[in-house]
Swiss-Prot record:
The lineage of its organism: Eukaryota, Metazoa, Chordata, Craniata, Vertebrata. Binds 1 Mn(2+) ion per subunit. It comes from the Eukaryota. GO terms for molecular function: manganese ion binding; superoxide dismutase activity. This is Superoxide dismutase [Mn], mitochondrial. It comes from Sus scrofa (Pig). Belongs to the iron/manganese superoxide dismutase family. The modification N6-acetyllysine is found at K28, K35, K74, K82, K90.
Length: 144
């Protein structure tokens, strides 16, 4: 269970800041493109990655939440977890270990590897988006 105050902070302050900052950076980037200012375009890349990633990651995070969530998944997802991790319990242990192993800010992820047709656990630093960083399709994100 995550309390309402934490969720309100995450939505109204953290996620909102990523969106607002991304909008500002995108405007500056468009100006740099129009001017042909490659130096400015390159200089804006870290802010695009951080704020764009923060927006992407938190948008995924909100879709993962449910007022009656928790417990084991059902159907194809549970079968894929058992196939790729041995059991739901082993999956939780591995995802927890990877997530708590993130130093500083970051994310623990369950993703789908399209090339291998299997689930994978990964971590990303800061607000680096999973798909843009690893190529995995994000299924579940844990903000650490």
């Amino acid at each position: 269970h995550i309390n309402a105050q934490i969720m309100q902070l995450h939505h109204s302050e953290h996620h909102a800041a990523y969106v607002n900052n991304l909008n500002v950076v995108e405007e500056k980037y468009q100006e740099a493109l129009k001017k042909g200012d490659v130096t400015a375009q390159v200089a804006l890349q870290p802010a695009l990655k951080f704020n764009g990633g923060g927006h992407i990651n938190h948008s995924i995070f909100w879709t993962n939440l449910s007022p009656n969530g928790g417990g084991e998944p059902k159907g194809e997802l549970l079968e894929a977890i058992k196939r790729d991790f041995g059991s739901f319990e082993k999956f939780k242990e591995k995802l927890t270990a990877v997530s708590v192993g993130v130093q500083g800010s970051g994310w623990g992820w369950l993703g789908f590897n399209k090339e291998q047709g299997r689930l994978q656990i990964a971590a990303c630093s800061n607000q680096d988006p999973l798909q843009g960083t690893t190529g995995l399709v994000p299924l579940l994100g844990i903000d650490v």
